[in-house]
């Protein structure tokens, strides 16, 4: 939000837009036949614990399936996805499903599934 000289951010609106976009993407993928009900871990871009908790609740996924690096290392931006995955590698075993999630300022989102 803003213009060429100044960016202004409405954090609440960005949060709401990002969550809505993530849910829309989830629904579209489900309509196309993707079933993530048995995904073992959801590794997300971590801007805050509030955001992760809201996403988990909105998707109906237990928060325990969203490993966090944020409380220890802070917001490390998009690097949180591979960083958190690397921290969880000892918990993963062959055949486990991991969903990587990224949401960019409420404007874009992507998911990628890895079968370990």
Segment roles from a protein language model:
Residues 25-26, 55, 81-88:
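Buried hydrophobic packing segments
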Residues 69-81:
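Active-site-adjacent helical/loop segments in soluble small-molecule enzymes
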Residues 84-116:
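Conserved beta-strand-centric core segments of catalytic alpha/beta enzyme folds
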Residues 1-70:
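Hydrophobic pocket-lining "lid/loop/helix" segments that shape and contact the acyl-thioester
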Residues 50-53, 78, 107-110:
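Short active-site-adjacent structural elements
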Residues 12, 20, 78-81, 112:
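Short capping/connector residues at structural and topological boundaries
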